[in-house]
Amino acid sequence: PHADVRRQRQMCIRDRGFMKQRVIELTDFGVAENMRPVETDIPSPGPGQIVVKNIAIGLNYLDTYFRSGLYPWPNQEKIKIPGSEGVGHIHSVGQGVTFLKEGDKVSYVTPVGAYAEYALINAAHAVELKVDVNDHDVVASTLKGLTTHYLLHLTFKLESGMTALVHAAAGGVGQLMGQWGREIGATMIGTVGGPEKAEAAKKAGYHHVIDYNDKDFVAEVMSITDNKKCDVVYDSVAKSVFPGSMDCLKPRGLWALFGQASGPIVDFNLALLSAKGSLFVTRPTLFTYIANREEYNDASYQLYSRIADGRLKVAIHDKMPLEKIVEAHNLLEGRKTKGGIVITL
């Protein structure tokens, strides 16, 4: 009988291993400490959904916006699981999904849901990996790289001979922007906070790097451009570089505000746009730009082929286990990172 009991217990443990998974639960909107690891059932996909067995997960500023409650939570799931990107193999496929199948290796971006061993996501947010790229490079670059692609090609068509200013040039998006913008033939000016970050931005292809802890970035931009200013400003910092970002733009230039690492801009007066030279402002988000399957496939190919052949180097700041997600968020929000953080499983 003892052997039978032991065997049954082992079977239970084995079944539990198949049926249960580790996820990160958000218990309440607010600080990073509101996240904790829990065990839950492996989900089943509904119509139009897939479940991906993650190999690795990426960390993005977007995760902090959903976690803090800045962005409304997009689903009604019982457990709130943050996380915006991952790479892995499809574990199961929901009804109506025809362009992906079980076993396919995919990368994906999603508003929430990635901080799990088995991520339940909308199939439209995944793309099959057809280029041979290292898994950690994939999760350190997918959301950031697709963001870089739409900002440089679609939100504004950056062309050879133009001048672009990029805030947070040493961050994950910033380092990809420097390299890709240089490839296009534009003059790339980056702002950073601190000498170490300045070094990282220079390595990432920026022609000019301004440390805004040390110098007035608007005055520096005027000097670099001989008072001609920039065609476009790519701003993921917001509050602390406002309204200086607009002062760096040529008449009819575009201010592309795609994040707010230093806090939101409140009480923005649209009349400022006319006062500063008939400027344009946009607040884009990646999911609008990958809603079209062909555009999503093309942007992914443009990104991964550049990583595979070395045109784009992916900066990885650190690799941390899923259980250290609180620490990872605090690093990111403390603006202590140079490149992406990879969450390992």
Where are these regions (language model features)?
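Glycine-rich beta-strand-centered segment in the early N-terminal region that forms part
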Residues: 41-58, 70-113
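Single conserved hydrophobic/aromatic residue that forms the stacking wall/gate
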Residues: 1-15
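Mid-domain Rossmann-like dinucleotide-binding core that forms the NAD(H)/NADP(H) cofactor-binding site
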Residues: 138, 142-214
